[in-house]
Amino acid sequence: MKVVKVGFVKVGNIGSAPLLEFLLDERAERQDIDVRVVSSGAKMTPEVAVEVAQKMLEFKPDFAVVSSPNASLPGPTKARETLKNAGVPTVVVSDSPAKKAVKQMEEAGFGYIIVE
């Protein structure tokens, strides 16, 4: 059985962020996935966002989820671009202000969930 590596990169904090990684394996019983979380805490600068995305790349995820408030800001943008440039399929989870970046995310091939 192939174990799928799932990475969660948290840049800043949105209300649903503490629950995201548990949606896939709440009881830690699944043997077909391996989950890692890397967070910047409250910081959302481009430099910190790139740092946490690069830390996630050390895990070599099969795909990643980047959560942040306002995904249109430079920090969250840099995090997802870092993962994309490394060839990691990425889904963005963000809040309403991220709607400003929907077209950009679609054109770049990112999946996204906007929590209102």
Model-inferred region functions:
Residues 1-90:
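Metallocofactor- and cofactor-centric catalytic cores in central/energy metabolism, strongly enriched
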Residues 93, 115-116:
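Generic beta-sheet signal
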Residues 95-112:
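Glycine-rich, charge-decorated loop segments at or immediately adjacent to ligand/cofactor-binding or catalytic sites
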